[in-house]
């Protein structure tokens, strides 16, 4: 019987959150309110608990929700290298390995695999508390500055903080996050 080996990866900083984003929005009561972090190894990480309201079957997270979480953590990985740049999804392939329980503390991490000009490819994993990979993804993203995303959405990039777009620190933010060791 094999046991999962874990490593602690240091958190460098929290990442931005939005007021009303479905994944990270702190004001979105119907959302997931996931917290995102930049890690010292260049990856992005997410900590979250999916409420029962987002099930596909009783007690199981809807596949679209877990796919959205993976999409977000991989798209955010570019900001570790380029702080004012965000990944906008072009293509995402998600694989589901195990049922994902609702109302359970979960984690995910995303990484950049290759950067080519204005695009990048990345991958991500969503973990159960015991370190089992419950879902994984690969994707292609376009790099866009947050100012452009805001402008194209009809927002003033200079007032994003007023709409809740900011880095938030919480008293219970981790100094490091425990993840299974990856087989490179």
Task: Annotate each predicted stretch with a short phrase.
Residues 1-13, 100-102, 113-184:
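HotDog/MaoC-like acyl-thioester-processing domains
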Residues 17, 30-32, 42-44, 86-92, ...:
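A generic structural signal for short beta-strands and their flanking turns/coil linkers
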Residues 19-61, 178-184:
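Catalytic strand-loop segment that frames the active site of acyl-thioester-processing enzymes
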Residues 35, 93-95, 107-111, 123-125, ...:
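Residues located in well-ordered beta-strands
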Residues 48-50, 96, 143:
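Hydrophobic residues in beta-strands and at strand termini
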Residues 61-65, 83:
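A short beta-loop-beta micro-motif enriched in histidine and acidic residues
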Residues 65-69, 73:
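Short amphipathic alpha-helical face segments that pack within enzyme cores
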Residues 73-107, 113:
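Hydrophobic beta-strand-centered segment that forms part of the acyl-chain substrate-binding groove
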